[in-house]
Amino acid sequence: MHHSAKDNYVHLTTTPVPRLITSLAVPTIISMLVTSFYNMADTYFVGKINTQSTAAVGIVFSVMSIIQAVGFFFGHGSGNYISRKLGAQETESAEKMASTGFFFALFIGAALAVLGLLFLTPLSLALGSTPTILPYTERYLGIILLGTPFMTASLVLNNQIRFQGNAAYAMVGIVSGAVINVVLAPILIFVCDMGISGAALATVVSQICSFILLLYMGRRGGNIRIRYRNFTPTLAFIKEIIGGGTPSLTRQGLASVATILLNVAAGAYGDAAIAGMSIVTRISMFINAFLIGFGQGFQPVCGFNYGAGLYARVRQGFWFCVKVGFFFLLVCAVAGMGYAEEIVSIFRKGDPAVVATGAAALRWQFITYPLGAWIVVSNMMLQTIRKPVRATILSSARQGLFFIPLIFILPYFLGLKGVEMCQAASDMLTFFLAIPLTCGVLAEMKRKEAEQLQQRQS
């Protein structure tokens, strides 16, 4: 681990790119996998209660996506800026941005919690709850909302630490919270007989623990410390957060809208269809955690080296991540196609309708899985190097621009099969859009390299 900002700068701009990305990606991948695992563990434990509880967790997931969107907005918006400024060795600006992003997220998270609790029943219905699912949704959501400010602030701390090149410190905070959740959830659900309320309480307690640990970790390893006196809500900083964070807000916000629309579309075919699609969402998140974690290992490398004008290292890192991600997702897709029923059955074995819907949707997902490597890594690069328009277009495509029309069109013509195949169809269209958006930027960096070489020679 590195113990000063200067050490981090030298490390991130001189270490061979594949080794550097791998070293940064491993703790991030562990964080992502453990977080996804505890999401799946929640689904597994709640699935032991009944189908309605499983569906309720899937419905509330869309609200958690909105909360995450706020956290990622401020975390990525401030983190991208911090990595570029540290790459340019402008530490004071980076320190002010760190505190500004953190306190904005904390205040807005608290406001969201209050609003959600005031309108709990209308919100639960709007998210797609059927009359039989509504009581479970209200119980689960009412507790989850209490953890909102801790969740948004934790995501900011996690991303800021990671963008400074100290992913291992970020991992400790995230993994510790996830482990607490996995241990606490079955105790509260079954031993204390709290049911779905126990699952929600375990999640909130784990979020508070992560928040405290990340605050502590943020004071170690040469990381920028959060101080209220550095809170600088100036127009310049707000514009930087908007520019760097809008792609994340768009991506996560549309993911939430997509989940709501998916639940509403699936709800036409019964509670089992909602539960089946909810399980597939959690499985996909777990597999994608590797790719996202690997891409997040690339982001500090991308930000520091782009800020330092080392464009060849940015391009090298991009292609390395795309290749590794493609082959990993290809292996997962091939292996998963033959065992879709068995995978879904882990979460809801006693309900054949849930298994049938989930297995069909999972197979459709696997068909386009390898294309996700290009989409995800492209989006992360565009966002980190401050290409907000391209990054926002790409981030809005997968679960907005393409998914939203498809979730209305495909079920109309194909029924339940249209619901099951919707995400795969959207992924295919997003891949074709991502090619020109990314290739233009890669070519631009290559031109800048040539100009630098020409200047050195002259």
Where are these regions (language model features)?
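Helix-terminus/linker motif at the lipid-water interface of multi-pass membrane proteins
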Residues: L33, F37-A55, S124-P131, I187-M194, ...
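N-terminal transmembrane alpha-helices
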Residues: L12-Y44, K48-I49, S65-G77, Y81, ...
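Short alpha-helical transmembrane segments in multi-pass integral membrane proteins
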Residues: M1-A25, I82-P149, V191-T246, C302-T368, ...
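Short runs within selected transmembrane alpha-helices of multi-pass transporters and secretion channels
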Residues: G75, I144-R162, A170-N181, A199-I212, ...
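Small-residue-rich hydrophobic transmembrane alpha-helices
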Residues: T54-V114, M151-A170, G276-A340, G372-L394
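Transmembrane helical elements of multi-pass membrane transporters/channels
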Residues: S23-D42, I143, G177, S206-S210, ...
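Hydrophobic transmembrane alpha-helices of multi-pass small-molecule transporters
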Residues: I66-A69, N181-A185, S210-L215, F286-A289, ...
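Transmembrane alpha-helix boundary and packing residues in multipass membrane permease domains
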Residues: T28, M32, Y44, F61, ...
